[in-house]
A protein has these predicted regions:
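Metal-dependent enolase-superfamily TIM-barrel catalytic cores that perform enediolate-based chemistry
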Residues: 1-83
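Active-site microenvironment of metallo-dependent hydrolases
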Residues: 214, 218-228
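Shared catalytic-loop signature of beta/alpha-barrel
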Residues: 65, 71-74, 80-200, 204
């Protein structure tokens, strides 16, 4: 849940609103939302606080202190990740830190693991080098008792790839099912559209990763030339 993306009136917060030390008014607003979410969900439901890397380290620590009261499962992307700033956040917060969609290689992850800066790693198959590279990152995370939640905010094709990988990981924790995986513009791209039932997925057993793009999606795709 993103508790800090809009003002009380519903206006989106901009970069200047979310950086630096947060005001007492902002903190009061965020805490009221955390409290409401916890009361509505009850004590048996896990809640992840999503920050999209908006605040800097100062504001992230302030938010983490609030989250400690509400048994938040993890603090996702508390700030733009650098080892120095995440180390500062980890030092002053007891909330587990989730991060990784903006880290792109096992060498970047290694620095976070060695310093115990992550409790939940979130590598993205699409920008981390594919299934094999994310498997290597996940195995390295296991050696440091770090859980895995593959970042999965793409098409249903991404969902299939993530599910196949996750079922091989002893340190797999949860599967991300993003809102984009229910949008017509996304679910209409592939032959199959996997959705959870009662909170659980069934791993597909079709050939390959168990899904494929529709020919119509390929024909209508926009092509970008990266280099000549």
């Amino acid at each position: 849940i993103d508790f800090f993306d809009r003002e009380e009136e519903g206006k989106p917060l901009n970069f200047l609103d979310t950086t630096g030390l947060l005001t007492p008014k902002q903190l009061k607003m965020v805490e009221s939302r955390m409290k409401a979410a916890r009361e509505a969900a009850g004590d048996d439901v896990d809640i992840i606080m999503e920050n999209h890397s908006y605040p800097d380290a100062l504001g992230a620590v302030q938010l983490a202190k609030l989250a400690e009261k509400y048994n938040i499962m993890a603090f996702e992307e508390p700030n733009t990740p650098t080892t120095q700033t995440v180390e500062y956040i980890a030092k002053y917060s007891s909330v587990p830190i989730a991060n990784g969609e903006r880290l792109y290689s096992r060498w970047q992850y290694a620095e976070y693991f060695k310093k115990n800066l992550l409790q939940l790693a979130q590598p993205d198959i699409g920008n981390c080098g594919g299934i094999t590279e994310v498997k290597k990152i996940s195995d390295m995370a296991h050696a440091y008792d770090v859980g895995i939640q593959v970042h999965c905010a793409g098409s249903p094709l991404t969902t299939n790839a993530a599910l196949h990988l996750e079922c091989t990981l002893p340190n797999f924790l949860i599967h991300e099912h993003h809102t984009c995986n229910r949008m017509d513009t996304s679910v209409g791209l592939t032959k199959y559209n996997l959705q959870p039932e009662n909170g659980y997925f069934t791993v597909p057993d079709l050939p390959g990763i168990g899904n494929e793009f529709l020919q119509e999606a390929i024909d209508r795709a926009t092509l970008y030339k990266v280099i000549e």
